[in-house]
């Protein structure tokens, strides 16, 4: 029996097939119209978002997650700027980087083509609604959105604005579809609709990602939890290290590229830790190892803290004897997201870059840069922590697959 969700996905699938063959000019014009519509609907979007924010606060959601949910004028403007960046990026579809001719005269081309219908399941981050739509449209894919119930008013308003924009273009409104029923049974059904959905990308916490991986029959790409580390080596510039730690922890603690654990070389711990505590200690709860406690006091870290994605004003701090132990700690407790070393030692930097197993590895910079817009992608579908198909921020080039086209003149296989 055809369910309502199946019907919804069938319409989306048909629209995505039409979109897959559209030219770049028409897709870019559609994006331009969506940007105009978002600008026109800015006040309405912020008004609807405020309903979600008030509901979240009433339910006691922690402030770092409320901040992730909140849309401001600047954040809506940021979405619009992101669309312009995507417009300016090269179309990833129907590109051939490899063409060769076989001995029998067949010409083989490896072409990039859209994936088809991409489903994205995400928590209370309404900016994902716009990022996901724009990236899937430019890459020729339809998108099925299932946001959190905590952002339902925001998502409805954003999808309304997107569809209003599409009315002024040659792209069908049906290329975007929102599941706005909070029934969690629909998520489970969505995960098994292989006939209509080609790929599902979950964006959220460990519980959501584990649920999707466990229950999906549709192929998935995990956008993993961000237990991100900063290792401060003995040769690091201490003042620069304090600035980077503050940025990575405090700027937006509720996002996946925020720093959750700081590892400090024992030779500079006495000089660095008081400065870190002085800079962030009033705002951030520091959970330290015994060595850390002996220098700055604070709460003693427990074993679970080393594996925790706090998404809050909490940081775990551990003093380590060398770069080898820092790397071992990161590879044991990390989530393969974003890791950083602060050092003036080129050998240690290269060792860290090669041996740390993560999607993004930094030298002398904040982990906060692991982001599609910061990488110049205009946005992202998520930050993949797996190794197959896509890894790191997923922009346009990660939303296509390949098709081999073979042109002959009557060849038969002997």
Curated annotation (Swiss-Prot):
The keyword DNA-binding does not apply. It holds the Pfam family Aldedh. Belongs to the gamma-glutamyl phosphate reductase family. It catalyses: L-glutamate 5-semialdehyde + phosphate + NADP(+) = L-glutamyl 5-phosphate + NADPH + H(+). One of its GO terms (cellular component) is cytoplasm. This is Gamma-glutamyl phosphate reductase. It comes from the Bacteria. InterPro entries: Ald_DH/histidinol_DH (IPR016161), Ald_DH_C (IPR016163), Ald_DH_N (IPR016162), Aldehyde_DH_dom (IPR015590), G-glutamylP_reductase_CS (IPR020593), Glu-5-SA_DH (IPR012134), GPR_dom (IPR000965). HAMAP family: ProA. It is found in: Cytoplasm. It comes from Alkaliphilus metalliredigens (strain QYMF). Disulfide bonds: none annotated. One of its GO terms (molecular function) is NADP binding.
């Amino acid at each position: 029996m055809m369910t309502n969700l199946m019907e919804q996905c069938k319409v989306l699938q048909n629209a995505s097939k039409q979109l897959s063959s559209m030219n770049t000019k028409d897709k870019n014009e559609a994006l331009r119209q969506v940007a105009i519509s978002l600008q026109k609907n800015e006040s309405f979007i912020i008004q609807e978002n405020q309903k979600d924010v008030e509901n979240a606060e009433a339910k006691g959601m922690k402030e770092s997650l409320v901040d992730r949910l909140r849309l401001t004028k600047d954040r809506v403007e940021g979405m619009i700027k992101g669309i312009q960046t995507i417009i300016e990026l090269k179309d990833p579809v129907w590109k051939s980087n490899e063409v060769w001719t076989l001995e029998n005269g067949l010409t083989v081309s490896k072409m990039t083509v859209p994936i088809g219908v991409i489903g994205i399941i995400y928590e209370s981050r309404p900016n994902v609604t716009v990022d996901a739509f724009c990236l899937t449209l430019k890459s020729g894919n339809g998108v099925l959105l299932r946001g959190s119930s905590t952002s339902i008013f925001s998502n409805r308003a954003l999808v309304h604005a997107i569809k209003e924009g599409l009315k002024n273009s040659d792209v069908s409104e049906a290329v975007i579809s929102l599941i706005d029923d909070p029934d969690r049974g629909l998520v489970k059904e969505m995960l098994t609709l292989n006939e209509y959905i080609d790929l599902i990308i979950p964006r959220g916490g460990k519980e959501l990602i584990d649920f999707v991986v466990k229950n999906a029959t549709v192929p998935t790409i995990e956008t993993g939890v961000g237990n991100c580390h900063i290792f401060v080596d003995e040769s690091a510039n201490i003042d620069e290290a304090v600035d980077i730690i503050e940025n990575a922890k405090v700027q937006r603690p509720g996002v996946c590229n925020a720093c959750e654990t700081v590892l400090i070389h024992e030779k500079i711990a006495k000089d660095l830790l008081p400065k870190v505590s002085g800079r962030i200690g009033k705002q951030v709860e520091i959970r330290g190892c015994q060595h850390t406690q002996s220098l700055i006091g604070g709460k003693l870290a427990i074993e679970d803290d080393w594996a925790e994605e706090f998404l809050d004003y909490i940081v775990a701090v551990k003093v380590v004897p060398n770069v080898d132990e820092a790397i071992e700690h990161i590879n044991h407790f990390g989530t393969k997201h974003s890791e950083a070393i602060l050092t003036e030692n080129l050998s240690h930097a290269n060792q860290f870059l090669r041996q740390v197993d993560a999607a993004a590895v930094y030298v002398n910079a904040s982990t906060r840069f692991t982001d599609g817009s910061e990488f110049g992608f205009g946005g992202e579908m998520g930050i993949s922590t797996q190794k197959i198909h896509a890894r790191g921020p997923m922009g346009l080039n990660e939303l296509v697959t390949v098709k081999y086209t073979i042109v002959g003149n009557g060849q038969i296989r002997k």
